[in-house]
Amino acid sequence: MSPQNNHLQRPPAAVLYADELAKLKQNDNAPCPPGWQLSLPAARAFILGDEAQNISRKVVISPSAVERMLVTLATGRGLMLVGEPGTAKSLLSELLATAISGDAGLTIQGGASTTEDQIKYGWNYALLINHGPSTEALVPAPLYQGMRDGKIVRFEEITRTPLEVQDCLLGMLSDRVMTGPELTGEASQLYAREGFNIIATANTRDRGVNEMSAALKRRFDFETVFPIMDFAQELELVASASARLLAHSGIPHKVPDAVLELLVRTFRDLRANGEKKTSMDTLTAIMSTAEAVNVAHAVGVRAWFLANRAGEPADLVECIAGTIVKDNEEDRARLRRYFEQRVATHKEAHWQAYYQARHRLP
C-alpha cells in the first residue's frame, strides 16, 4: 500500500491488495470470461488465498460456495448474498467485484431513503435548465457507470430499499439496457458492456421489511453465507483481523490469545443459546464474527491508550457489554446470568479473572 493511502481509515480491497492483484494478473494463464480482469481460478485464489503464490486468505468460506458465486457471475446472472448480519457478505461482494472488475467502488447503499436517481442517474440542474436534457447534464449513478464501463455494481442491503425502487433493476438484469426517456437518439439507450453485473446483499433479519418481487428474485441466483462453524477458524480470523486493526491504530500490542479465547467462546456460547434454545435465555443481539473483531479492537485500544499495556480479561468485560446489550435491558440481565452460570464454572486462570471482573458490567 502506497504511503498516501496509509492514512485511510479503511482502504478499499483494490488498494489494500494491489500487489496481490498485480501478481495474480501477471501469472494468470487461464481463459477469462469477457470483461473480467482475472480468470475464475485466479479470482478464487484472490479470495481464498494461495500459498504457492503467497496470496492471503481474506474470508472464511467454503471453496465450493466461492466457485458457485464466480460461475453465476460469469454466466451473467445477478448474485444475491443472503445471511445473518456480520457474516461478511459485504466483504465478500467487495472481494468478488475487485477480482472481476479491479474495482469495487460502484456501490449502492440501500435504505428507506434510497431513490431511483441514486441508482441509475440524476441531473445537473444548472446544465439541464440552460441546455436541456443531454449527456453533459446527466449525472451517472453507480448502475449507469457499471453498464457503461462494464464493471460489477454492488447493491448493499437491497431489502431495505422500497419495493418500487428495487424493481428499477428489472430491465437492466434481463435486457441489459437502460432507457433514458429524457434523451433522444442513441443517447436514450445505454447498453451494458461485457463485464457488467450486479452483486446484491440482504440480511435475513430484514426479511419482510421490503420483500423482493418474484420477478426480481428470478433474475438473481441466491447464495447463503453462513456464520463460521469451526471455533479454531473463527479464533484465527478474529486474531488476524483485530491485529491488523490495532496495527493501523498505532498500537504495538496484539490482544493476548487467552483474551481472544474468552471473547470468541463467549460469542459462540451466547450465539448457540439463540440457535439451540438451551436453558440459557435467548439474546436479541447479533453475535457475529464481525462484532467479535470490533470488540477485540476495542479491547486493544482501551488497554493501550488508557493503561499503556496489552488487553486483559477486565478490558474485555468493559468492552463486551455495549456489543451484547445494545438497547435491550433484558439482555443485560441475561449477560449477567451467563457470567454466573457459565463463566464461573471454568477453573482456568484467565476464565477466573474474567469472572472476577463481572462487577464491571454496566
Swiss-Prot record:
InterPro entries: AAA+_ATPase, ATPase_dyneun-rel_AAA, CbbQ/NirQ/NorQ/GpvN, P-loop_NTPase. GO terms for molecular function: ATP binding; ATP hydrolysis activity. It holds the Pfam family AAA_5. This is Uncharacterized protein YehL. It comes from Escherichia coli (strain K12).
